[in-house]
Amino acid sequence: MSDRPGSASEGEGDEIRPYGEDRDSSEESEDDDPEEAKRIAEGFIVDEDEEDGEGEDDEEDEETRRRRRKEEKRRRKKERRMRREREEAELSEDELELIEENRGLREGRPLKRLRRRSGSEGSENDRAVPTLQDMFRDDEDRMEDDDDDLMDFIEEDEEDEANQGETEEQRRERKRAEKLKRREQARSRPELTGVDRSSWDEIFAVFGDGQDYDWALEGEDGMDLDEEEEAAKKDLRLEDVFDPAEIKARRLQDEDKAVANADRPERHQIVNSTLSDNPVFATDTLYPPPDFAAKWVAPKVSFRTQYLFYNQHPEGSYPIPTIDNPQPYPVYRRPDLEIEFEKAVSTALNMMFVQHLEVPYLWHYKRDVFSLLENQGQSSVLFLERDELWQVYVLGQRYRAIHERNEQTRQQWGKIKARKGDIEDEYFTKGLLGKACVASIEAAGEGDEWLAYHYASDIKAIKEEEAFDEVSKKLPERAEREDIRRGRIMKLVEAFGIDANKVASSFQDVHGQPAPVMNPDKMPLELADEFTGAAYSSPEQALSAASFVLVQELSKDPAIRQQARDFMDTCGLVTVNATDRGMSVIDQYHLYYNFKFLTNKPVPDFRDSPQFVHMLKAEEEGLINIAFDIREDMLASFTDALIRCCRSNDYGEIASAWNEVRMEVCNTLVKKHLMPMASKWIKEHLRTQAEEYIAERCREELELRVNVRPYASSGMEQGETPSVLAITNGKGDIRDAVMAVMLDDEGNVRTQTKFDNLRDEEDKTMFIELLEKRKPKVVVIGGFSAQTARLKDAALVAIRQHAIELLGQNPPVSDAYPDHEGFQYAMAEYDEKLKAHLIPLIFVNDATARLYMSSEEAEKEHPNLPLNGRYALGLARYAQNPLNAYCKLGKHIASVTFMEHHQKLIPQEKLLYHLERGLVNSVCFMGIEINSCVADPYQRAMLPYIAGLGPRKADAVIYGIQKHGALINRMAFTDLGLFGPTIFENTAGFLTIESDLKDMMLEAENPQEQPDPLDMTRIHPENYEFAQKMCQDALDLDVEDVADRHKSEVVQTLMLDDKRGKKLGELNLDDFAFNLQRQGEGNKRHTLGEIVSELIRYRSDRRPAFYVPTDWEIVTMVTGETERTVGRGLKVTATVRKAISARVFCQLESGLDAVLERDYVADEDQAPVTSCDEVFKPRQAIKGVVIMPEPARFQVRISTRPSDLRQGVDFVQPFKDEEYNSKDRRDAAEAATAAKKQRRAGKVQRIVNHPNWHVLNSGQAEQFLASQHRGDCVIRPSSKGPDRIAVTWKVDEDVYQHIDVQEIDKPNEYSLGRILMVSGQYRYSDLDDLIINHVKATARKFDEIQMHEKYKPEHELDAFLKNYVQAHPGRSIYGFSVDSDRPGYLKLCFLSKPTKDGGVIQTWPVRVLPGAYKLGNAIVPGVTELSNAFKMQYSEKLAEQGHQGKTPGIYLGKTPMHLGGRTPALGSRTPAMGSRTPALGSRTPALGSRTPALGSRTPAQGGPRY
């Protein structure tokens, strides 16, 4: 990074000048702005004498002030030198604070907002609202000198005689060397700073020697900070030295510190995942009354609770059968407990949102609160299970959002009442805010819109009074409706006799009686004729206008809209219509085939299914259209219910006529307003529902993987951590050595060894010696190819030989036995003896190891380990502690695949949120020993998942314990200020403190200074009294026996008693719990049971045994093949490796071995094959069908017999058959496809003599080009007719442009035209001319843009812009990327300020032409000219809009191209000295005779494929 403001770099923004003039402060002299010079000088020179003389300096000119400053420096020069000698080996106070903060020895200073360091070009106060003023600065500053006017503010000190002749660069280098020398001296004498040498080494390893940030400590002229700059130095903050992005990544922002210090769970303070790179901090608002919230939350908790307590769902539909339990026992409904259930939900909401207790704490320590004891404690009913508690928390958040939105609406109503006096609207306050608007967040928002609709003029007046900005949200069509409703036509509306409020109230009450409707005494048209005139020329128009107003009023009512949504959710039908492209692309092998002909599938059937997100993805790809409908009879029933509330019960001609008009209003309301609105809502609702389902299934899969004990071989005790030897050969290439990494039982790397090949005798011997020396409990193996199977075989041979050596007995030899049966018996006996000495060899799930091996963290932790060695280390760690391995991944856990096909379709933030919940459940189930966790950096990864904590609070806890030392007991958490009361209650039970139980000396005095045996258990401190009482009863001790002892002494005595299980088992917990409940202590049955379990086996690991993958899972992990791809009956393609007489050895593309026996080469009716090597040759490709997969041996047996091939299948759909696929539609589509093929078969296929010609469709052409380079193309037939061809060329990875080429002057139907025209303007003589001068010329412009420093890949561009403006406040930035949505286009994106401050990334399209770029009407030959064109067009747009430099389009949150349907400033000439191309001064030069018209549209760019 350059330290010269005028230098250009990729990181700097450029300046947009809205008025076309240069206003760079570096070009102004100090005399132009003496106040600015004085302000900057004050930032550097802080001598008291100068401060006293500031008033006089104001009257002096700049030259006088500079001379006085120089004299002052000379006067202090000698004193400064003497002081510098004393400070040679010392660190500044600020440096010490930064070091101590990073070591965790002191609390960091509160972070403030980012400030400019002294000497910068301007201050925050001088800068207006951030604009794009500086976006193009680097393009212009490259023309400037390296020096700038900042050098004028501070004169250089006079140097010593010896240094008079040195250059500026030499002087700076000398200064840096002196500073480095001082740092080295301080490092060599750590006692001067209170930092030991090992800590110094660690600090230097992490933060470097500080030279990276020397620029932050240098003055404007490059000089180091001296005496006059000490004040500025003392104000130096973290933001002044470190990049804001790094501060954010380390969670050191002000918001992060606030979260860490607040006495609330971290996950309650952040809306999304605490692991997210972009956390959304929640506001601390008062939660609504839990009793009211419970009435909304309780009916929505789960299928189980709806079935049990609300009599919903068909009888017998719960429990749902599973694979493990296909015929579950029936569960009896308990509707009599509905009120008790709502009380339990209310209690849960109160604990979560008022008391701030997290779900794991409630589940483990407050489960009794959510259950009811019956039959005198002999049975209980559990109201809320663990996952249901999490759902209550989610629903509670939603209810709070609804409540807050309604409160905002209520406040607006209060302002209206205050303005209008005694106005009352009972329907709004009670019917809407009290009922309808509480139903959903959509209804809450509609309540605000209803208020704005009915009180538009009042709200407008209120906003004017409060000086609201014109940018405030504007309701659509309001002006037109207000005009209509203020006119005479409202009298005709009243004549309809329909009160929208009463209709809505009646419509909600199915069994209620509609309000009576009065009829006028005239016919509708007769009455409407009275309102004709200038506004309405006929009674029909007047009646239509009145109907329109009535429809609008009814359609705005939240109650009616909510009824429509509920109706669509219950009775909606979904139909899929494939597009023309979808009909050809989605074949029977496509993932979308199972819903290609989906017809009238009920909306409720999409619950608990990921199918809808696949449908949305297919629609996004342009393959299908999703339609929502409702059966005619159901829709008629809904409409009739609405008509019932609007019609009159009178009889007669007039009443019938008015009822007809009212019926028409209701039909219009339903079909034109309510159903379209409900269809849009249900689409997003089903998306959310499917995403939640996928995220939850991923969480469940994660918990299955991590909720297991460490691997334990026979003979190991429960809870013991194994020593592990991990081996891998990577991809199995000949260049890949076998890496072995040994971890001891404490997780330390004991050795790392490399073997060339374990089949070699020398390497095998070395491997056996390693086993003998390190004695691992288990050997784990992994790899990335089928070659891992060969490594496994070689390792098994070596392990068996090692076991034979330990046994000291050779295996039996067959020659020594008279018969084979005797030999087999002896061999079985020998193997049984050998089993005790065999070290287990297993595969483990390598998902965490794959991510760890390529992570930056792995490279920092083990820089000497090769990539495969880090992978082996990851395998070993997983075997020792799967939970810790997944916790260590942090946010990267979302990269692990838990649900194939589905997981990638949901947002990463949502997935991360649910996966974090899974880790929280798992870590809290097991608990953590806090002292060992803090001492081991690897174990620390689990601490954030303890209830109440998170990454920020965990860092604070680690820092505090490192500062104060290991904890003695749980009271230390609060005594040392590590936890507040709320966090202590959440976390205490999950954090144990290990002590030597036998050596404890417990005394009654000073319990806070002694260990407590209960702290070794997962018993919560609030239950210590129960535990102590139960131990006392189990030991048959009276109260007097323990009166003068430490309260937990009885616990220690019992825990040391080998018969404690029997003694505790004699306690009658049911009676004890029932008596406690009668005494008002509440239900404690579960708590008492957990206490007993912990006292018998404290911190015992209750998780299932370590899960070893199945053979098929191993094959999938190593090769990617599944039972669905190489299962029995599937067709495969194999390559012959070796053929012998009896069989053929082949290999599949995935590396799996395939064996073809001679008997399976040909059918019986064919000529017999006597020798396979006569039929098959090496490297020959053969088609076969799998007849027997053998996953344990990494091979399949195949057959090439024609009869077997006819029965084989090419593909097995990953999804089950959809019962709602229409067979008639499928048959019709297949018939149409067959007819099309028949027509093609009877038609002569066109052949063009050119190497790029291929008979492919658009999709096949893309697949063909996938492995090619940019600019490569395919020429193919066009579906538009015989006089056209199509050219598909590769723009970028996964981006292809399809160009329509018209043939002119064709000799005949099958010959190529003599003129090839693209979009009617680009003419080419032949295909080579078209490729070179059109395709290749366009591709070169893409290559050129990618060489520019502002180009970024499309998926990185947004992050690049956001990170830049965040790291450089006040600056703006722009960048380019390929537009994957519009092949042949570029994106020009720019951002003026951080998104958190309202910045919006805006995008302008840039068309890439053969040899040029087109931005609007400007056609430019190069990237520099493109940037200039952008500057000029943007400046013109600013001038047009008159926003005084503010970014256009920022208020509407839209890209400028959406304003008025046009790209800003693209519809007019680009101003540049009267020329077409900016900054060139002349017309765009001709780019070739073949492409004369660059200003016109390139065909098929971003358009349809041909």
Curated annotation (Swiss-Prot):
Residue ranges with Basic residues bias: 66-81
GO cellular component: transcription elongation factor complex
S-S bridge residues: none
One GO MF term attached to the UniProt entry: histone binding
GO biological process: nucleosome organization; transcription elongation-coupled chromatin remodeling
Biased composition (Acidic residues): 24-35, 45-62, 90-99, 141-167
Composition skew (Basic and acidic residues), residue ranges: 14-23, 100-110, 168-190
Nucleus listed as a keyword: yes
Region feature (Disordered): 1-194, 1460-1506
Job of this protein: Histone H3-H4 chaperone that plays a role in maintenance of chromatin structure during RNA polymerase II transcription elongation thereby repressing transcription initiation from cryptic promoters. Mediates the reassembly of nucleosomes onto the promoters of at least a selected set of genes during repression; the nucleosome reassembly is essential for transcriptional repression. Essential for viability.
Family statement drawn from the similarity comment of this UniProt entry: Belongs to the SPT6 family.
UniProt-recorded name of the protein: Transcription elongation factor SPT6
